[in-house]
Amino acid sequence: MAKRGYKLQEFVAHSGNVNCLSIGKKTSRLLLTGGDDYKVNLWSIGKTTSPMSLCGHTSPVDSVAFNSEEVLVLAGASSGVIKLWDLEESKMVRAFTGHRSNCSAVEFHPFGEFLASGSSDTNLRVWDTRKKGCIQTYKGHTRGISTIEFSPDGRWVVSGGLDNVVKVWDLTAGKLLHEFKCHEGPIRSLDFHPLEFLLATGSADRTVKFWDLETFELIGTTRPEATGVRAIAFHPDGQTLFCGLDDGLKVYSWEPVICRDGVDMGWSTLGDFCINEGKFIGCSYYRNSVGIWVSDISELEPYGAVSEDKNECMVKRFSVLNDQSERMGSGPRGSVSPDYETREIKNIYVDCGNLNVAQNPGSLKATLPLESGKVATMVSEKQNAAYFGPAGDKYSSTSRDSDSGEESSYSERESIPFSRTKSGMLLRPAHVRKTLAKFEESKQSAVVQSATRKKSGLAVEEEPQTQNAFLSEQNASKPFDAEDSIIKGITNKFEKALSSEPPTDEANRMFLKPPRIHRSSNSKYNDTRRAMSADPATFGKGGMENSGDVEDIPSKTERVLSREKPGDEQKNTEYPSGSRELNPVKIVEGVNVVSGRTRSLVEKFERGEKTTHTEGASTTIEQNNNAVQEDPRKTSRQTGETPVISTRRARSTPARVMPIVLNRDSNVTSDEPPLTQPARTSSFPVMPVILNQASNVTYDEPSVALTQESRTSHARILPVTFNQATNITSEEASVTLRRQRRNSAARVRPVLLSQATSHECPVTSVRPLRTSPARVMPTKLNQSVNMTSDTSHIASMHRVSPTQMLATPTVIDQVADMTLDETHATQIQPACDNMPQKEEPNISDREDDSDITENLMLTHNEFLSTLQSRLTKLQIVRHFWERSDVKGAIGALRKLTDQSVQADVISILTEKIEILTLDMFSQLVPVLTSLLGSRTERPVNVSLDMLLKLVAVFGTVIRSTVSAPRIVGVDLHANERLEICQICSAGLHKIQRILPVLARRGGLITRKAQELNLVLQEP
């Protein structure tokens, strides 16, 4: 082996022994060393004086690491304490405690403020620098951990231990994914391939092994060397692996596994090395000294020059191959390398939904050999593009079209650095691995091209390099500095997004996003939620304050909630310009405040007082009660009849109005033919009166009178239907229908009454205030219906299926309590097998367009009242959010018992999971539990999504803390953490008992509930 490596410098680094060192991979110009003198020293390669010494440890430093920007420094000590320094501020910013023995390995997460540490206590811990605590603990090694490496996408972390085992951990699922046990010595170094789905492991057993991360199989191993492996790293182009041994440097190709070159370096203990600008830079240590070693990669195979004799031999031997390639290149389609797919940058760490990597091979051009510095620049640019991609997205890759040189990026934003993927979802696109024959063929082709250029008189002294033939000219001309600045800008964005500073304008406007509307089969009710969607373009820079539509809502709603007379309200509406608005919107501390209401609610929340969301509704109730003073008993004559009255308490869910079915042998007499509906503020459908066989009807007085008081909803009157063998002896057969003001439709549920009496029994249904819309349902008939009435202009046929005739406990629970006269017997009719199918009711007396418009406008005030209530609650939460009081916002959310508002806020928090702490998790558990009991689908889905992410982040911490033995002594922080974890654990156990019920609902809820149940069952 030729002497192609040399020592650049050597200097004394510490007053005691040097235990560890690390080179910054961004610039390859900074060096960290840790020693027995409890210090971490920063060095600039090429200089012998330390510009900075970091103090704070009280025991020897065993491990050090830079972050990707070389701004933060991490150091683990023999006591198990980990300290974090900021080089720009020259101070220690964090200290982490948790390991029971020396911290032997530390590593920064590639994105976000996370880090991992391994210790001799066999535990691997993942820490969050903002939460100042451990968020995940992995146990499985039987001896200490010696090295740690994150996957390029940050979703996996790999640990190598003194037990000769390499373990792959899935950060998203929080569990062991796979382990490799083929080494016979302690693991000393790990590295991921920059382009392929491949892992290399170096061990003290003097071998390097290559593992396929798609199948988790061993695909190759090197022959045992004379000495053990100290450090390994892939070349940025991915073709070769550089392996630092105890006594020298080896260069391996990984497919096939061949030793391409070797250099005797003469170092003592290699600590770390890097490859930058065509140079190999290694750092070794011995006692208290550090040595810097350099080797020129252009002089190493397969990147170095081949001898002249070997060139000529290759030209003669493969001249036929050259002629064939020239003939193929002159044809209509140029020759394409069979291994072009291995040269493309592939998105190898993406979700299942983002596998649209462009693979258009096109024609590939062979470029002239470039200087080693330019080669490294292009390769580094390629690698950075694969990891970061354009526009600042974390997880994206760029595939290059060889024909046009265009780039297409495929990226997906992540809520946390390692989320949104299940266990084992790291994927790799199909690629072509080169066999030995293909590798030799590509090498021979490169030699033939070089010889051809030499014969033509080209003044090129450097020998060709195989990888240059696959780099596009556009990529070669792109400066590295521009790419480096893009990467720096991307990283700065991530740091700002994950920092603990007060929320930015984007965070302040997080609640201005249009709520997600889930359309279920209950569309009549869900259609009213459409108006909540807001066009983001209508919001200005100031958020809600600059939106004219939002400002108009409180003013209109204030008129609804006011106690003014209807005449006054009409006067106010005569001024559409807003000059006569009663209570304009005011802006107080960035929050829209309606005078006299919103601000008082916010102040009450700050004082901790209890508030209610029914204040506005009570005003409307009082106004409606004043408008309706009619006694329902006035509709019946003083002739001794006993009215049947159905009453119901106020409720917030849609009501079901019960149609009355009068069966056989029922005699109803009346002198007054019109069937009228009394005047009222709002009403529900008049229940259809169905007179069955053998019924004698004479209009002596109203047969059915329905009076409904104090309502904010209204519905249309349903027809009166007469069945077979019905004798109608009436001089006036018309039915007068009086339509009153109404706001929403109601739902009809059938009640079948069998009456065998001739008493005059008017049936009166009295129902109190209803605050939510309902749905009209078709009525039910007992037998086939023949319309034989002169009132056919309002008649319709209603048919139902047999199953709709069954009375279930749910239906009975929703029906109002009825008190019937002793002469009236209530009976539930059995289902008939020969019932006709369900059919939509056809009402012939349709309203004209003006009536429809009027009816729609009558529901407008109720809709605005609902929106105003939700807006007020969201403003309360936003009031805390703008003060960076996330905990206070969650506390306010618990008091606001509005599931729609809770679902909206939690859906935003799901996208910002990094701001939540374990304490906030304990406060969110009751809210999430209540959302799981919602009858609508969206709150349940939002709750399950949040629980899946929270359990993935905090589940391991909660389980380990609750199951850990009690610590002897007084530790206030430990006791507080234990109490919080116990609260979270109890809440999760309660949720786990609810999941089997949710799993039976079907659809997306079932899948998420089953997934959460499996996660909670893990030990």
From Swiss-Prot:
Assigned keywords, A-Z: Cytoplasm, Cytoskeleton, Microtubule, Repeat, WD repeat
Answer yes or no on keyword Cell wall biogenesis/degradation. no
Residue windows of the WD repeats: 13-53, 56-95, 98-137, 140-181, 183-221, 224-264, 266-303
* Coiled-coil portions: none
Task: Report the principal subcellular site.
Answer: cytoplasm
* Keyword Hydrolase attributed: no
One GO molecular-function annotation for this sequence? Answer: microtubule binding
- Could you tell me which residues belong to the region Disordered? 388-424, 455-474, 517-581, 607-652
Q: Which is a Gene Ontology cellular component entry for this protein?
A: microtubule cytoskeleton
Against PANTHER family, the record matches this protein to: KATANIN P80 SUBUNIT, KATANIN P80 WD40 REPEAT-CONTAINING SUBUNIT B1 HOMOLOG KTN80.1
Describe the function of this protein.
Answer: May participate in a complex which severs microtubules in an ATP-dependent manner. Microtubule severing may promote rapid reorganization of cellular microtubule arrays. Confers precision to microtubule (MT) severing by specific targeting of KTN1 to MT cleavage sites such as crossover or branching nucleation sites. Together with other KTN80s, regulates cell elongation by modulating MT organization.
Q: Per its record, how is this protein called by name?
A: Katanin p80 WD40 repeat-containing subunit B1 homolog KTN80.1
Lineage of the source organism? Eukaryota, Viridiplantae, Streptophyta, Embryophyta, Tracheophyta
